[in-house]
């Protein structure tokens, strides 16, 4: 049985005051949801603050991005070792905004995936298609290609200790949400494709849905057999919304 995971990606948002208020606002719901894992991925500058805030509750900590490098002359980068030192469990990798705005190729994503695992973190591998790719029936090809790029480097068994997040790019920050049927269709395809490589991995790996998840849509989405939770963007910044999403995962 796969444990539902609700993960908030705060992106480039927050202040010292708002970060504290947000954690305090969601911690009771996170602690009460015994069968749901809750995690947050703050901007790097807030990782130490959040680590202290979640030290005595059940909320897990994640990074939004890390470097493939551990140390050295890499201005502006953050290594997986650094975030691990502050108690992080997860790191996102391959988010569509990293792919789009930072030109991260499948090869770069694969290298980061390996570096994340090698340094004791759990990678949350983000995959998904653009609107143009969906409208030209390329969704399945896109997610397979993005997965294969990682598996070719890491091996299929590495996904036993990883999370996959399917995020249709056309639904991120747009207010558009894939219907529960559309999302389940892609999640089921991902799991079936993985089963061709390893039935063990396919049965075990959590596949999250990411793309304008809201409290109003969470319960129906998470009721689908191959949707194991959500990677939540804007709604993760709102206490009531995020609590509602956690409730929807129970």
From Swiss-Prot:
Its EC number is 5.3.1.1. It catalyses: D-glyceraldehyde 3-phosphate = dihydroxyacetone phosphate. Its main location: cytoplasm. The keyword Transcription does not apply. One of its GO terms (biological process) is glyceraldehyde-3-phosphate biosynthetic process. Substrate binds at residues 9-11, 173, 212, 233-234. Signal peptide: none annotated. The active site is at 95 (electrophile), 167 (proton acceptor). It comes from the Bacteria. GO terms for molecular function: triose-phosphate isomerase activity. It is found in: Cytoplasm. Keywords: Cytoplasm, Gluconeogenesis, Glycolysis, Isomerase. InterPro entries: Aldolase_TIM, TIM_sf, TrioseP_Isoase_bac/euk, Triosephosphate_isomerase, Triosephosphate_isomerase_AS. Pathway: Carbohydrate biosynthesis; gluconeogenesis; Carbohydrate degradation; glycolysis; D-glyceraldehyde 3-phosphate from glycerone phosphate: step 1/1. One of its GO terms (cellular component) is cytosol. PANTHER family: TRIOSEPHOSPHATE ISOMERASE (PTHR21139:SF42). Involved in the gluconeogenesis. Catalyzes stereospecifically the conversion of dihydroxyacetone phosphate (DHAP) to D-glyceraldehyde-3-phosphate (G3P). Belongs to the triosephosphate isomerase family. Homodimer. This is Triosephosphate isomerase. It comes from Psychromonas ingrahamii (strain DSM 17664 / CCUG 51855 / 37).
